[in-house]
From Swiss-Prot:
Enzyme class: transferase
Organism placement in taxonomy: Bacteria, Pseudomonadati, Pseudomonadota, Alphaproteobacteria, Sphingomonadales
Catalytic activity, EC: 2.4.2.29
Binding site for Zn(2+): 308, 310, 313, 339
Keywords, in A-Z order: Glycosyltransferase, Metal-binding, Queuosine biosynthesis, Transferase, tRNA processing, Zinc
Source organism (scientific name): Novosphingobium aromaticivorans (strain ATCC 700278 / DSM 12444 / CCUG 56034 / CIP 105152 / NBRC 16084 / F199)
A cellular-component GO term for this protein: cytosol
GO biological process: queuosine biosynthetic process; tRNA wobble guanine modification; tRNA-guanine transglycosylation
Job of this protein: Catalyzes the base-exchange of a guanine (G) residue with the queuine precursor 7-aminomethyl-7-deazaguanine (PreQ1) at position 34 (anticodon wobble position) in tRNAs with GU(N) anticodons (tRNA-Asp, -Asn, -His and -Tyr). Catalysis occurs through a double-displacement mechanism. The nucleophile active site attacks the C1' of nucleotide 34 to detach the guanine base from the RNA, forming a covalent enzyme-RNA intermediate. The proton acceptor active site deprotonates the incoming PreQ1, allowing a nucleophilic attack on the C1' of the ribose to form the product.
Family: Belongs to the queuine tRNA-ribosyltransferase family.
Protein name (Swiss-Prot/TrEMBL): Queuine tRNA-ribosyltransferase
Molecular functions (GO terms): metal ion binding; tRNA-guanosine(34) queuine transglycosylase activity
One family name in Pfam for this protein: TGT
Cofactor detail note: Binds 1 zinc ion per subunit.
Glycosyltransferase listed as a keyword: yes
Length: 374
């Protein structure tokens, strides 16, 4: 079986469609990865996540290292066996969550010392420890350890942060390669940094390319800069990365973010939005998002989305979903989460088909017309 390969099947402008082959299966691109923070995609069984069309899910190093602990997961047979998911898993490095603990962490060249949000216990997360945790979890796609600075900081601060992330990338590469059997069946992605600065992004991309990775992530976006600034950065950042490797935009995003990023050459995405929104009563549809707590749905016997074939849309009315969310019933969160994941996977499938058929521009225009019609 192939450890890791990426083949581009078709392009349309900057948009690409293809497939990643790994030992645990194929990942069709552009791909959206549901987020399974604590070894679960919230409110979903793994078989239902797969039924939605997901080829790969994301696990969170920070949360899993604290509870139940990477060593315990390893003793229990690894993350796949632990949660019952037999397809590829990408794990983040833990860096983003640790950096967000601004009052509870200290950054040095060695790594980041932080206090657990659970019990206050002290931990050091370094490139080497991050690689060890992801190996213990049994991740298929491992992410380098990096720092994600705020985009509104001075250029010299962002430059110093990026340069340290590149040194950490080298250490991540070395530690990953020393991982024995796990390194022989998994892949390692580097993470480009540099905030919104084209020159810093180019320096970062060149440093990562010199080290060499199976894929490349675009980090440091979707952290409050806004869609306009994000798209302006994506006008150049993906093209700075190797064209023959997958490009992964971390933490993105809203449906229109995904379309705009694919338009600019991105292949992979993850975001908590479809699951978190589902728990909070928001449904994504081809005609824009719906707030199912709104009284206008109270007697609506129609489905969430007439174009959606998901179990929620084929079995339940808007009125029933409104009732569940107004009543605080957990089934409401489950049904909207299931629908949202189906919607995201249908969006990705639609983009893949449109790119393959050379009609992506028309697909994107039609999507925006309908999605923003309200």
């Amino acid at each position: 079986m192939t450890r890791f390969s990426f083949k581009i099947h078709a392009t349309d402008g900057k948009a690409r469609t293809g497939a990643i082959q790994m030992m645990r299966g194929e990942i069709r691109t552009p791909a959206f990865m549901p987020v399974g923070t604590a070894a679960t995609v919230k409110a979903m069984k793994v078989e239902d996540v797969r039924a939605s069309g997901a080829d790969i899910i994301l696990g969170n190093t920070y949360h899993l290292m604290l509870r139940p602990g990477a060593e315990r997961v390893a003793r229990l047979g690894g993350l796949h066996k632990f949660m019952g998911w037999d397809r590829p898993i990408l794990t983040d490095s833990g860096g983003y969550q640790v950096m967000s603990l601004s009052d509870l962490r200290k950054i040095t060249e060695e790594g980041v010392t932080f206090a657990s949000h659970l019990d206050g216990s002290r931990h050091l997360l370094s490139p080497e420890r991050s690689m060890e945790i992801q190996r213990l979890l049994g991740s298929d796609i491992v992410m380098c350890f990096d720092e994600c600075p705020r985009a509104d900081q001075p250029r010299e601060v962002i430059a110093r942060s990026m340069e340290m992330s590149m040194r950490w990338a080298r250490r991540s590469r070395d530690a990953f390669d020393a991982g024995g059997e796990h390194a022989e069946r998994s892949a390692l992605f580097g993470i480009q940094q540099g905030a919104l600065d084209e020159g810093l992004r180019k320096t970062s991309a060149d440093a990562l390319t010199d080290i060499g990775f199976d894929g490349y992530a675009i980090g440091g976006l979707a952290v409050g800069e806004g869609q306009e600034a994000m798209f302006a950065t994506l006008d150049f950042a993906p093209q700075q990365l190797p064209a023959d490797r997958p490009r992964y935009l971390m933490g993105v995003g809203k449906p229109d973010d995904l379309v705009g990023a694919v338009e600019r050459g991105v292949d992979m995405f993850d975001c908590v939005l479809p699951t978190r929104s589902g728990r909070n009563g928001q449904a994504f549809t081809w005609n824009g998002p719906l707030n199912m707590r709104n009284a206008r749905h109270a007697e609506d016997t129609g489905p969430l989305d007439e174009r959606c074939p998901c179990p929620t849309c084929t079995k339940y009315s808007r009125a029933y979903l409104h009732h569940l969310h107004k009543s605080g019933e957990m089934l409401g969160a489950m049904l909207l989460t299931e629908h949202n994941l189906w919607f995201y996977q249908q969006l990705m499938a639609g983009m893949r088909a449109a790119i393959a058929e050379g009609r992506f521009a028309a697909f994107a225009a039609d999507f925006r017309r309908d999605y923003f019609a309200r």
